């Protein structure tokens, strides 16, 4: 199981703990009266000590498995990428394959260590804190309790409505982190971990390939082609490219360079979420068999593919909301979730049926609860 999936499980398990703690104060929320709300709040807050320990124990138990998954996807799989690329390079150069270089293993060790440090510091350690102001799970629990009490005591909602709505609001948002990007966007646990893991693994594999090219003193490569591509990749996908910039004495002016198409930047070639790969190319030896797609059509298809990704995220989110709704006993929301899930799945089916380059990827629509 991928590190991203393990963090999704972690978040959903923690939400389950919060919901169970709330139910533990008054199992039948339908019986809770407005005048009992202040007393209910006090009883709910008293449970925070036990809830804190429960969350900490669970995170401690899961952390080694997550750390191993991160190590495997970066170091173990990255090593396989390097070995395979070296084999391909040796074949086209008619050489004996070289073992993975020290530079490559150091690169893999560095990326694995950096990734786990970022995840551990920004996610795991915060969930291990006994400080209610720093632990995101406890902050969410307190927020649900306090906002629900306020909504009831001011006459805005019934106890059941207030509790149901506040739980659902947080499930939609996800457990928070303290991270805020340049645009002011606050990262959730799931969003942050998925982005870090996806971005780092793709970057690692591409850097491993680039290092192999250096190890074999090669500067040309074939860039894979896809029917759907981002703006930066569409003009050069499927072509032979330079992996060095214009100023390098080994630069071959017959071919474009990835540096002219945003290489090294998030939105550029081989940037964040870019699925393109580089393959060895030797002039006079290698035959480029990549299919060539119209540039504008590939960009348009890329936008359509992003719509599929959006629908898939919505299916996952509604499934998470459904799980929480069923756990707390919110039957109306659970029914609404079922309807929304079917609606987005229908949109995915239609999109896939109308576009031959798309395929249905059920794993992208599922959460661990639905598997």
Curated annotation (Swiss-Prot):
Molecular-function GO term, any one: structural molecule activity
UniProtKB keywords: Coiled coil, Glycoprotein, Virion
Sugar-bearing residue positions: 124, 146
One GO CC term, this protein: virion component
Coiled coil region boundaries: 336-367
InterPro entries tied to this protein: Phage_A118_VSP1 (IPR009319)
Compartments where located: Virion
Broad class of the protein's primary localization: virion
Family to which the UniProt record says this protein belongs: Belongs to the Lactobacillus delbrueckii bacteriophages ORF1 protein family.
Listed name of the protein: Structural protein
């Amino acid at each position: 199981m991928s590190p991203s999936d393990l963090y999704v499980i972690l978040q959903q398990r923690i939400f389950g703990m919060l919901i169970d703690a709330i139910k533990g104060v008054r199992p039948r929320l339908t019986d809770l009266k407005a005048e009992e709300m202040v007393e209910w709040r006090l009883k709910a807050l008293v449970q925070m000590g036990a809830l804190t320990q429960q969350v900490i124990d669970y995170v401690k138990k899961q952390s080694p498995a997550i750390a191993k998954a991160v190590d495997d996807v970066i170091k173990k799989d990255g090593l396989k990428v390097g070995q395979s690329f070296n084999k391909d390079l040796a074949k086209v150069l008619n050489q004996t394959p070289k073992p993975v270089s020290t530079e490559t293993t150091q690169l893999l060790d560095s990326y694995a260590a950096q990734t786990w440090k970022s995840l551990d510091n920004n996610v795991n350690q915060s969930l291990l804190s006994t400080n209610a102001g720093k632990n995101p799970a406890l902050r969410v629990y307190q927020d649900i309790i306090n906002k629900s009490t306020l909504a009831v005591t001011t006459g805005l909602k019934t106890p059941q409505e207030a509790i149901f709505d506040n739980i659902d609001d947080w499930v939609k948002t996800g457990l928070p982190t303290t991270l805020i990007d340049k645009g002011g966007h606050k990262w959730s646990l799931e969003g942050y971990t998925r982005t870090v893991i996806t971005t780092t693994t793709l970057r690692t594999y591409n850097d491993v390939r680039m290092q192999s090219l250096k190890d074999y003193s090669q500067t040309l490569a074939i860039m894979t082609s896809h029917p759907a591509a981002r703006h930066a990749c569409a003009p050069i996908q499927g072509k032979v490219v330079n992996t060095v910039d214009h100023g390098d004495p080994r630069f071959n002016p017959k071919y474009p360079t990835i540096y002219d198409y945003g290489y090294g930047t998030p939105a550029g070639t081989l940037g964040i979420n870019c699925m393109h790969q580089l393959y060895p190319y030797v002039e006079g030896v290698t035959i480029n068999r990549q299919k060539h797609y119209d540039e504008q059509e590939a960009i348009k298809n890329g936008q359509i593919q992003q719509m599929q990704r959006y629908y898939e995220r919505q299916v996952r989110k509604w499934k998470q909301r459904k799980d929480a709704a069923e756990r707390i006993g919110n039957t109306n929301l659970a029914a609404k979730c079922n309807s929304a899930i079917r609606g987005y799945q229908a949109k995915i089916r239609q999109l896939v049926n109308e576009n031959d380059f798309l395929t249905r990827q059920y794993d992208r629509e599922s959460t661990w609860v639905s598997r």
